[in-house]
Amino acid sequence: YEKNINIIMGNQIATSYVRKRDCYNQLKGFMQHEYPGKICALYGLRRTGKTVMMYQYISELSDKDKEKTVYILCLRECDMLELRQAMEDLYDKGVRNFFLDEITEVTDFQKYGNTFSDYFAAKGAKIVIAGTDSLGIMLAQSDILYDRIQMIHTSYIPFAEFSKLIENDSVDEYIEYGGTLTKSPYKTLQASEEYQNTAIVGNILHSLEKSEDARRYGAAITELYEQNELKSVLNKMINKFSYYTTVKAVNKCFKSAPLYSTIHNIQEPSYVSLINTEEANQATKNALGIKDLDEMQTSLSKRHLDELKNYLLELELFLEIPSYISLNSGERSEDLEIFMQPGMIYAHSTALIKNLADDSMWKDTCGIADRNLFILRADHFVKGILLENIILAETYKTFQKIDLDRYYVSQLSITLRNNNQHVEADMILVDKQKGESYLFEVKYSNQIVIDQTKHLRNTDFLEYIDENFGKVKSRLVLYTGASSKQNDVLYLNAATYLKRLSIVSNTPRPEIKQLLNENCNTSKPNLKTTSRKKPRKL
C-alpha cells in the first residue's frame, strides 16, 4: 500500500505556523476528551488551514505522544482496503492518533468510511480526517457516518480572524482576498477561476460521482447530465453574485447618460443583459464554460437545480438571510443571499468592469471620457457593496450564534404608504425580547457626509420602525474613518465593529451595547454635504 499512501510519524512533523484558526480549540477538545465511536472531520474549502491545523496539533504533542501519532496522506487511487491495512499495521505498533489527510481521494470512502468509527475509534483510536473534496465528507456524514462524526467547519473566515492570522487590519485586504488564508486564489481573475473550478465546482462533482457510486437506488445526477453541463450550471450559480455586484457598482457611477436612464426604467433582474455585452464577459464565459440562459432552461430540472444550489449551501459558500417588511405582523420580503467569498466576487467584478471600460461602443453610449477614472469609481462602489455584505453576514451569523430566537438581523427597503417615500437601512438589528431596534448605514468611505444619514434621520421611517420592528434605540453609520458622534448618529469604524463582533460572539450573556460602544471621539470634523445612494430593491 506504500505507493498510494504517504506515512509520516508524529516525531517527523514540524510546522512554522504559530498563529491558529479560531476553530483550533475544537480540534484540541476532540483529541483530549473521550468521544466513543466517533471521529472528527475538518470540513472546508481548500486553503482554509485544515492540513496546517493537523500539523500544529501534532507538533505540540509530547515526544511520547508523538510516537503514538501518525499523519497519513492519501494519494489518488488509494482505496479503503489499502488504508485499513496500513492503519492496522500502525495500530499494532502502538499508534493511537491517526490524522488522515485528503481522505476524499480514497475511491470508496463513501462506501466504507464507517470503518474508522465502527472499528478503529471503537478500539480507542483517535481519528481526524480532512479532504479537498469536502462535500464528500458531508455526504458521508448524512449516510454511513451518520451520528459518528464531529464536524469542524473551516470555510468561513470572519474579518477578525483573517486580520489576526495575516496580521493586517485592512478592510480592503479582506474585501480583495477574503475567503482563504492566502492571496494567491484571488490575486488574478485566472487564479480566481482556477480556484472556483477546483475548490468548488470540482469539489461538488467529484463528491457526487463517488457518492452516486455508493447509492443503491435513485437517479444519479452525474449520469443524467453531461459533466460540462453541470459545470456550467454551478459556475452560473456562483457568478450571478459577481454580475449583480458589477451591475450595481456601474449603476452608482452614473447620474445621467443613456445607460443609467435605461437601467432605472426596468426591473433589476433584467438589467444584467444590458451590461453583459459580449466584450464585457466573453473571456469569463469561455474560461468557466457558462451557457446562455435559454440553454440552461432546457437542461436541468428544477429539482436538480435546487439540489446543486443546496450543495453550494452545504459548502458554506453563500448565506440565506430571512427578510421582513414588518417583523411584528410577520409580512415577509424576499430572502437575502450573500456570497461568503468576497475575494472571489471582487476578482470577477473588477475584471468585468475593466472589460466594459475597454468596449469603445459601450463607453460612447455611457459617455465615459476617462477610462481610468471610471475604473477607479467603479472599484470604489464594488468595495462598498462587498463591505455591506460582509458586515451584514457577520452580524447575522454572530447573533444567530448568541440567540437565534431573540435577535433579528437583515436589511430593510420599503416604500412608505402614506407619502410614497422610498426608505431603507443597510442593516437592521432587532432585540425582540426588549422590543428595540438599531439602524445602520454602511459606507466605504472615511468621510462624514450629512447625506449619508438621510434615511436614519427620516422621522416617517423611524416611526415605521417603531411600529413594525421595535423602538429605535440607536442609529449608526459604519465606515472606514475614525469613530465619532454627530447629531445623535454614531459613526463607527467598520474594522473596529467587525472585531467587536468576534469578541461579543464569545462573551457569555453579551449585550448589544458592548458592540456599539459610544465612548468615541465626539469632535466635529469637517462635514461634507454630497452623497447619493441608489435605493436597494429587495
List each model region and its residues.
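Conserved lysine of the Walker
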Residues: 50
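Interdomain motor-coupling "hinge/lid" segment immediately C-terminal to the ATP-binding subdomain
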Residues: 140-276
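Sensor-1/coupling segment of RecA-like P-loop NTPase cores
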Residues: 119-141
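Accessory nucleic acid-recognition modules appended to NTPase machines
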Residues: 212-424
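N-terminal pre-Walker A segment at the start of P-loop NTPase domains
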Residues: 1-31
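A cross-kingdom feature that marks ATP-driven nucleic-acid transaction machinery
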Residues: 47, 323, 334-538
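Hydrophobic positions on the alpha1 helix immediately C-terminal to the Walker A/P-loop
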Residues: 53
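Conserved P-loop NTPase "ATPase switch" module shared by AAA+ and STAND
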Residues: 91-110
